Structure formats: C-alpha cells, structure tokens
Amino acid sequence: MKMIVRRTALAVCTFVLALILSTAASAACTGFDDLPETADCYESVMYLAEHEITQGTGKGCFSPDAPVTVRQWAMMLCRAYDVKVEGSSWSDLSQSAVEQSYRKGWLNETALSAPNIQLCRGALLKSAFAAAKIPVYDSVLYAGGVSLPDYENCIRIGKELQLCGEANTANEIVTRRDAAMLLHAILTRAFTVEAPPAPVALVNAAGVNINDYLLALRQVPEPMLAAFNAAGWTYRIDFDYISELSKQLNMSCIGATSYSQKTIYLSEASATLHESGHFLDWMLGFPAEHEQLYLAEAQNSGLRDYAKTNAREYFADCFDYCIIHGNDSKMMEILRKNAPQTCTYFEELKKDNWSR
C-alpha cells in the first residue's frame, strides 16, 4: 500500500511539473495582443521573445509601430549577445545596457547623454553591424565609388544585404518593428561583405575592420605606393607588435617602421602618413639634406615635440603635415613661416613625384 501511494505521488508530481513547464513555455510564446500572425515582423518578434531578447512594452503589447529608442535598442543588444547589465529597475537596467553597448563599440557617445532619443535607420544599421562584426567599407574604396558619410555607407551595405528596402534612407526614424526584424536577421543569418582591394601588400594580423586603414592609404601619393610595392614592403596591422614595442620603449606607440624587415607596423590608422614618411626617407636614401633641415628648422617649426627629437622623426612629421594640409594655404603658410627651407624642400619633392 505504501509503495502504491509513493508511486502515485511521484506520478502526480511529474504531471504537475510537466504542466508547469508546459504553461511557462506556452506563456513565453503566446505572442502580443497588437501583433497578429500576419504581421511581417511576427516571426522576428516571436524569435526575440522566445529567446528573452524582448519582453514587449507591457500589458501584452509589443508596440511595433512605435519609434525605437537608444535605450530599448541597447537592452535588446545586450540580451542578444549575453552582455550582463545591472540594476533593479527598467531605468537602471537600460542605462546599464547603454553604457555596456558604448564600451563594446556598438553605440557612440551621444547615446550616453541622450539614451531616450529615437534611432534613425543609419544609426540602427551602424550599431547592428558593429555588434554582429559585419564590416562596413567606404564606397570610395571600390572602383567607381564616391566617399560617403558613415550612415550612408551603412544604408548602402544594408541594401546590398537586403536588410532594408531600396526606398529607405539613413535619416528616417525607425520603429520597434524595424529593430526586431534587423536583429532577428543578424542573429540567424550569415553575412559577407566583400572587402575592397588594398593598394599595397597588407597583413591584418589584428583581424580588425580595415576600412580606416584603407582610407589612410588613399592619402599616400600613388608614386610612393608604387615604390612601396616595387621594393617589397608590407603594411602590417599588428596590435601585439606595437604593444610589445611600447613596453620596450616605455612609451605609447601607434606605429613603427622597420627598415630591415621592410614593414610598416600599425595599431591605429592615423599613424599611416607618419610611417609612410619614414618609408619615403628610406626610399630617398636618408640624404644628408634631411639632417641639415632638421638642425636648421626643427626647433622652431611649430610641429609637435616628438618631431624635434631627431632628423628622421622631423622628416616623417613634415611629410604627414604636408600631405594633410597640402591644399590648405593658411596651414602651409604657417609651415613656410616657421620652416621655409623645409617647406620648399617638400614642395619640390611633390613636383618631382616624391623622388629625387
């Protein structure tokens, strides 16, 4: 008799547990009152709900047509990518999500100060691409392309990947429907963006988006790029190398040039022109004139202190300055006033296609 009672109790407990689990699963998938099964975003929203990425806006609603805010989007991203957020209220949790998304590089600084603003499509796509590690390259890097703002490039890629419609624009405000459909897509599908060709032998040891590096290389004069390739040099994005070099030199480095290895090492694209200046110095054979210009004009050149440490750094910084400000008459006039011989020397180099 006791055995029968125990078995009956076990069966009842098993049944109740199964009923609870079934009810919980059913509750998570019942949907939202304002989201019919015929809605184009139904599958996306239900996927996000089932994976606890969205809980709707309360009272059984999802509010698909309401504009999505930075705060709401940040919460969805953090839930989608298992990023821990802290807080005891929606306000605290969502603010934590915004801060975490900023640290991850998914949102910009504006999000921190204005988490309640509505997102435009360009911003939504840029954030989604950053989270999903989908690279975005400037249109100008492709044959026949033109330079576009960040959001316009995101729209271009979004259309190529069919993540937005042909009629969609970068500045239009997006809805919770749009956000749900986009997030569902990047979580469940694989996307490939063809990288533009590099003008030199490029090694991406850091495995980062090379867009900024390719844009920086566009600033280097073509005759120098041709000489770079002809001489067998390599442009290498290598965070580990630069980090180790910084430790050895006890200073913060973002670029370095190894003449023996014929390699420019970088951890930031902004160092491209300076390091290219070192290559130019090497290409010209380190002429004595460079040392003479340094001794005569470096200290009063108006350039940063680092440029005044030796002739090679002075030459590299002058090259950087002349490329960046070459079309700015006021900035070039400042260099001419402070370092007239140097200014004339670089003007002649430019006329001679950066060779002697």
What are these regions (language model features)?
Residues 1-27:
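Gram-positive cell-envelope targeting signals
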Residues 13, 52, 60, 260-262:
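Beta-strand-connecting loop/turn residues
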Residues 19-198:
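N-terminal propeptides
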Residues 31-32, 53, 212-220:
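Export/targeting segments at the very N-terminus of extracytoplasmic proteins
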Residues 198-210:
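Fold-level signature of zinc-dependent metallopeptidase catalytic domains
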Residues 216-218, 222-356:
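Active-site-flanking segments in enzyme catalytic domains
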